[in-house]
UniProtKB/Swiss-Prot annotation:
It is found in: Membrane. The keyword Cell division does not apply. It comes from Arabidopsis thaliana. Keywords: Membrane, Transmembrane, Transmembrane helix. Coiled coil: none annotated. Belongs to the sterol desaturase family. Pfam families: CER1-like_C, FA_hydroxylase. InterPro entries: CER1-like_C, Fatty_acid_hydroxylase, Sterol_Desaturase_Related. Residues 138-272 form the Fatty acid hydroxylase domain. This is Protein CER1-like 1. The chain crosses the membrane at residues 19-39, 48-68, 126-146, 186-206, 328-348.
Amino acid sequence: MASRPGALTEWPWSPLGSFKYLLVAPLVMASMHSYVTAVDEEKDLSRLMIVVLMLWRIVHSQIWISVSRQRTAKGTNKIVDKPIEFEQVDRERTWDDQVIFNTLLMYLANIKLPGASHLPPWRLDGAILMALLHAGPVEFLYYWFHRALHHHFLYSRYHSHHHSSIVTEPITSVVHPFAEHIAYTLLFAIPMVTASLCGILSIVSIMGYITYIDFMNNMGHCNFELFPKRLFHLFPPLKFLCYTPSFHSLHHTQFRTNYSLFMPIYDFIYGTTDNLTDSLYERSLEIEEESPDVIHLTHLTTHNSIYQMRLGFPSLSSCPLWSRPPWYLTCFMWPFTLLCSFALTSAIPLRTFVFERNRLRDLTVHSHLLPKFSFHYKSQRHHESINTIIEEAILEADEKGVKVMSLGLMNNREELNGSGEMYVQKYPKLKIRLVDGSSMAATVVINNIPKEATEIVFRGNLTKVASAVVFALCQKGVKVVVLREEEHSKLIKSGVDKNLVLSTSNSYYSPKVWLVGDGIENEEQMKAKEGTLFVPFSHFPPNKLRKDCFYQSTPAMRVPKSAQNIDSCENWLGRRVMSAWKIGGIVHALEGWEEHDCGNTCNVLRLHAIWEAALRHDFQPLPPSPL
């Protein structure tokens, strides 16, 4: 928000939240009904295309969001290398308000404005007139209006809201107070209203003009340079007719230069072109892909997780992954969800790609996505292809000089690759160190269990983490109750020889601390006493069936305050909370440990040292749950 918010700062429908799209629903239904029921001579395709344009604008902007976030995480041609935090994401989450506003006005114009209904598909004279009006009056008026917005009175009340984002994302371009958008809409309406009054407006010219505005806005704020030098060498006047991302980026860092809308000619005419324009452009083109110190390899979970990942919807990725997806994803977007899921996992070459970049002290940490869902990992027939992708990612990272790769979620399954041991045995000369994160996860779980607990129930699949936790607890004198004979036998074989109790009696459901993981059944949860604390040791959280019980987070810690560029949530974890498996790789690199930390067994003797190292680097335990 602006430093001193003026009148008409907030959008009128702000209280509606995500239900704001209901404002256009009656108009959409009415236009569809009239088109279907009207006779051929009275059908108005132009009115029907308004909703198509609205949907296209949202998809178009989302494409820019995803591409920009991936490119800036990768680092190639990046312009401003500063962090984006949750504060900016929250401020920009209403970027689609202007789409709703424009849609409502277009419906009104279609009904009331002469020449704005029953439009032909295409008219060349109308398109030429609109192009000339944009290059002339629109660009000229915008330039001077923009300069006026930088006067202290208007800047402090309105435009400072937009300039709160020093590092821009595509959607930053449309994050303005409501009053500013009224002015911008009047400006951009000049070509369309004039063509309409002249009777030469067409469907293609409207859609093309608005798409041009959105494209240029998004491109100018994408924070990576994409114009090749040869383009300006082939056509030198282009420098005055089309701005570049680096050109507008200077406006956000210098404030008093580069005011033009899309055509820099007005800055050249009035002497407000920044002196660094050419040098920043050339320097941005020379920036190569960044080589990180640590790579964390993860994957998608559910189909709807494509929206919650960092390259998805910013408003969703900045919040923990939901147990129940939002109503609009389930009801309206499932075809798009399936299409995107198919494209990610089948239609494009399968390889990992970077989607997030964090800074922690002197470390650069990249998160890479393996484009597979959780259900792929549970199918034996997908194991070979998944291992091939992981293997290629390890070798590529090793070649680039990456220090550590941590295997997140199901990439470190024992059934898949022996918790990473398979790659170490196959490539014994690897310089990169593989960390499956199990040691860090185990020590986090151990320290999450209340100190006063003397007896706990163990229930879930017996994994490497679970075995290490049970062993350590038994060594500390905590009685661990196991409910299945098979799990009891495996734990005995692994070296647990005291404080381990096997019982199938209902009386042994009474301890108020349960150590749980994948495999716990809903019926078993219901047998726990009121007030029981469930402590997960697995990647995935248990179903929260009991409102009278407490559920801890999956193994995780809060990141140091010095950690930068954290603008999204890691799956179901909260803001600035990181999974233990990812922390394991980071701590391994910070400590400079030379050995791999992966394989079928966990070195229990090192757990305390790993915990102390995490605390030493300012990772903080999550607040304890009551017992």
